[in-house]
Every structure is written in C-alpha cells, then in structure tokens.
Amino acid sequence: MKFSVLSDDKDSLARTGLIETDHSKIETPVFMPVGTHGVVKTLSPNDLNDLDVNIMLSNTYHLYLRPGTEIIHKNNGLHKFLKWNKSILTDSGGYQVFSLSNMNEITDDGVNFRSHLDGSEHFFTPEKSMEVLSLIHI
C-alpha cells in the first residue's frame, strides 16, 4: 500500500491524497460506503462499480459472527466471497468493545463479547483479531 499527498491547503491542514492498494486507487477524501457484513445494503458490486466506488468499509466483528470466518476462508477470502475486486477496509472490531459495552466484559487480556445474534460468547484478544483478519484474507 502506498499513500501520496496530491495537494494541500497552505491556510489549513486540508489535503487531498491517493491511496494505492493491490486492489484499487482511492482518492482522498473519499466517500466510503459501509458494508458491515461485507455487503452494502440495496447495492450490488456491479452498482458500486457503476458508481466508481473503489473502497468499501466492513467490520471484522460482524463478519466473524455472520457469515463467519470459516465460510469466507473456504471461499478464498472476502474479496472472492463478495465478488468485489476493489479495496476493502475493515476495522478490528474495537468499536464494538464500546458500542456493545452492555454485552461485553473487558479484561487485561482482551474482551469477552456476547453475540447480539444468539448470546454465544467469544473472547477476542489482539491476536484473535489479527487471526480473523488473516482468515478472511484482509
């Protein structure tokens, strides 16, 4: 991945840039549609391509719960599973530590999540988060 500044404003901290990944080039600032579970509601990958979307935001925690890392891994990663050849930005699931705090227990070693889907418990450490990202090929 490579980032370069294309222009900046001398009177402020504003700037434009270009992020180059193996999957696409993204001009910044950028509108990034949210596909929490790997899909953007109401829009197909073809629709996103027609709109010149070069990056989608997804969420590691939600992908882990549904459809699950095993299914994504068996399909050779999130890009192939989604039939999406552009860039995907995923977060680590850290936001859910706080947004779902009433269902979580934070320890010195990690976070015990209680699934909002079925109540099952899942313990996430930084290493577990990286393992999930690796399994879905991000």
What is each residue range found by the language model?
Residues 1-31, 77, 98-102, 118-121:
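N-terminal amphipathic alpha-helix/helix-capping segment at the start of soluble metabolic enzymes
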Residues 39-50, 124-131:
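Short, acidic/polar
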Residues 24, 56, 91, 133:
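Conserved, mostly hydrophobic/aromatic
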Residues 136-138:
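Conserved small/polar residues in nucleotide/adenosyl-binding loops
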Residues 26-27, 34-40:
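Residues that scaffold, gate, or flank divalent-cation-dependent active/transport sites
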Residues 78-127:
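A gly/proline- and charged-residue-enriched helix-loop-helix capping module
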Residues 45-47, 66-78, 102-105:
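Glycine-rich loop at the start of a catalytic domain that most often binds anionic cofactors/ligands
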Residues 33-37, 61, 93-95:
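Active-site beta-loop-alpha junctions enriched in small/polar residues
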